[in-house]
Structures are given as structure tokens and as C-alpha cells.
Amino acid sequence: MKTRLLFFVGLLVVATNSFSQNAKDNAVYNAPVVQEQKLNLTNEWDKTFPKSSKVRHKKITFHNRFGITLAADMYIPKNTTSTRNASGKLPAIAVSGPFGAVKEQASGLYAQTLAERGFLTIAFDPSFTGESGGIPRNVASPDLNTEDFSAAVDYLSTNELVDADRIGILGICGWGGLAINAAANDPRIKATVASTMYNMTRVNTNGYFDKGTAEQRYQMRVELSKQRTEDYRNGSYKRSVMNPKPAADAPQFMKDYYDYYKTKRGYHERSINSGQGWNLTSNLGFMNSQILQYAGEIKNAVFIVHGEKAHSRYMGEDAFKLLKGDNKQLYIVPGASHCDLYDKVNVIPFDKIEQFYRTYLVNK
């Protein structure tokens, strides 16, 4: 009898502790975990492309799981019925890139154009850049930037205008590789487009066209590690020089970068590529990890778009080889260079991109 009594007392203690722990867990869960930073957002139209009369535009903010508040432009189609579900909700697409650009450049153009075609879209500034929050400024990280895409999906999934089961993403240049990386990690992303993509971990590790050597990587690590010490000593971060005026014999793609980022065509004062520069030590993170490791496990749809004459074409084609399933597509744009797919609306295959999203976000 005494043994049985002790047994029931023990059960009561366990149950009480369990209830107490559940209450604590619920209290923690119900407490506010993130307080978004109040960002200083511009109100005027300061994009590198004209404003469309076919969409409504507004500024929004959201946060990632690291607590960083991101700034975005939302584009909402004014008159569309073909993409709405029975409840009137829209499919949505989050757009970012190129790597080192801001939402007022190519990503905004893509987002606005797709909104004209019936999709609710957002173009966002990555963590630590543009109008988004985060300190220090001008830092990139493969993990953090992959997370930025999923954070955009968090926001869209809870937006009253959006059908949470019909969300896609689109990454341009270095954000194309990050978009595929995000799709591998986040099954909520039902359709992914990578336009004129870079694999930033590959090019930082191996150099262009994989011509880098192990010794060169080691020497770069030595220099960047020294730079860390100097940055800490100085209390500031040394930045890279982005897209200086190229020499006459420079590769054509370097001339193309200069033409986009440093001239009226695509210059924006908040753009890292237009002049601010990355913190040099950002390279360390991209040299010590590789994205696309699980690209072959993506079950949802992926569409890779690249230019026939793009210096980066090999990165898109190699990424496509990693993908599996009949819902994966590769399209090579005849005659197009890497930067042609930033802003040349007569070259960017918007009809094909729209059809891809309609297939996997609208007609699913």
C-alpha cells in the first residue's frame, strides 16, 4: 500500500511539473519574441524604372528569424481575376537581387512586371543593406541571405491578400543561387525562378570559371583574417571597391557591370554595387560553405533562366544538372548577356516566367 501511494505521489509530481513546464512554454511562446526595428523608408518613387499605372505600390517591413527587420516594396495588381482563388486571394512572389543591388533596381523591375501580370509581389532589400536593418552595414552571408527569402515567405504566408499555398520566389544573379538554396530548405516555396544566376559560394571559393587554386584560397584566407584583426582594432570595416571603371582590355562582363551600376541606366545611391562596397570579410562566409548541397532534394518547381552569352551561364547550367524531377526547367535566352537580364525588358523572357508561375502557382 505504501509503495502504491508513493507511486501515485510520484505521478502527481511528474504531472504537476509537466503542467508547470507547459505553462512556461506557452508563456514563452505567447510572449513577443521580435520587436521590429523602425526603419527610415523613403516615400518618393526613387526606382531606376518607371512606375506602372497597372499596380498599387506600398512600402512594407518584415523580420527574419535573426530579428533583423527588412524593407520591401509591395506591388499589388489593380485589376485581375485570372490569378485569384475562390476566396479572392492572390498568388505571391518574393524577389531579390542582384547580389549587391537594392530593391529599387532590377528586383523591383521584375516584381512590378510580374504584378502587372496578376501576382502580388514584393522586392526586398537583404539584411544589412539598402533600407533594411541590421548592424554592421554591407554584410553578406549565405546562411543569413537564404533565410531572408524564407522570412519573406513568412510575411507573405500571413498576409490577408495572399494565398499561403501559392507562394514563389525569384532571385537574380547571386540571389538566383540563394533562391534555389532557399527552395531546398523551405517546402512552402512552391515555385522558384533563378534568373542569370551566380553560385556565390562557388565563385568566391574557386574564382571565375573555377580557375582558383587551393593555394590562392589559402592566401586569400590569410589576407582576410588579417583584415579581421585590423577591422577590430580600428572599430570599422574596410570595404571593397565595387565596379571601378574598367580598362579597355577588361572582360566584357566587367564593362557590363559598370554600365549598369555606375551610369544612369541602373545607378542607385543605396546600392552596394553602385559604390558603397561590401565589407571585405563577408567573403569568408562564402568561402567556407557551399550552397546548393541539397538542390537535388527540391520537390517543387524550379525554372533557371540564363543568357546565351552570359559569362555566368555555366553556373546556371551546372545548377540545373543538380535538380531532379519533370517540374524543373532551363531556358537559355538567345544572344543575351548576364546584365541584359537585369533590366532589358525586351530580352528578359517575362512571358515564359509568367507561364511558369501560372503553371505552378495558379493552375496547380
Language-model-detected regions and their locations in the chain:
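N-terminal cap/lid segment of alpha/beta-hydrolase-fold proteins
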Residues: V34-G88, Y342
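Short beta-strand element of the alpha/beta-hydrolase
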Residues: R84-P98
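The serine-hydrolase catalytic nucleophile loop
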Residues: K89, G100-Q112, P126, G316
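Conserved alpha/beta-hydrolase
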Residues: A111-G133
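Alpha/beta-hydrolase active-site loop
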Residues: V139-E160
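Alpha/beta-hydrolase-fold enzymes
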Residues: I180-T263
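Short beta-strand/loop motif that positions the catalytic acidic residue
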Residues: I298, I304-H306
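Catalytic histidine-centered segment of alpha/beta-hydrolase-like enzymes
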Residues: A336-V347
